[in-house]
Amino acid sequence: NDGQWNNQKHLYKPAEGIYVAPRAPWNAWNMWFQEPIDKMFEELIQMMIVCKGVNPNKVYLMGYSAGGDGVWRLAPRMADHFAAASMMAGHPGDVGLQNLRNLPFMIWCGAEDAAYNRNDECAKRGKEMDSLQLNCPDGYIHQTHILPQKGHWMDREDAAALPWMEKFVRNPYPDTIIWRQEDVLRDCFYWIS
């Protein structure tokens, strides 16, 4: 956990804003899947708004490798907190994507990143997002990038996610939401509780 965390601190350089690389409080394969993480992110966002003047409608989520696993989990659960999200080299597991209706979402994976069948699973999830958007043209904004001849490390091609995400501003009151609960139960989503 510490090795990847130290790497992530300097991996991306956004053109504007504050870049934060949080460390999970425990060392476990499912470090980002557990319920206390949601509260940690909520409090981190609130502190950044109050202490650093961060615009709450311009908060973005991204993660690489195990952090990408976390994006797969956190983005659908906390879609109401972010303006956009980008997942890099993570495994989706069995997560549902329906809650991403109002959260622009990017998928990045190397075509040769076959550990745990990660490459095929990311491609499948990209097609699932295509299908969701086909049935809901005003939602499910997304891009899927399965990079040929790249493995788990994508030579920073995935950094293209930053300017893409920065184009989006969160709408805290969208006309339509989809809220499906999974492993971690939440007591509210957007304005519904």
Model features per residue range: what roles?
Residues 1-50:
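Active-site machinery of serine-nucleophile hydrolases
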Residues 15-19, 55-59, 78-84, 101-105, ...:
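Loop/turn elements at helix/coil->beta-strand transitions in domains of secreted/extracellular proteins
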Residues 24-25, 111-114, 149-150:
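Acidic beta-to-alpha connecting loop that harbors the catalytic carboxylate
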Residues 33-41, 66, 116-121:
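Phosphate/oxyanion-binding active-site loops and adjacent basic polyanion-contact surfaces
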Residues 57-101:
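Primarily recognizes the serine-hydrolase "nucleophile elbow" in alpha/beta-hydrolase
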Residues 106-110:
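Short beta-strand/loop motif that positions the catalytic acidic residue
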Residues 111-142:
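Active-site-adjacent alpha-helix of alpha/beta-hydrolase-fold enzymes
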Residues 130-193:
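Alpha/beta-hydrolase-fold serine-hydrolase catalytic core, especially in secreted/extracellular enzymes
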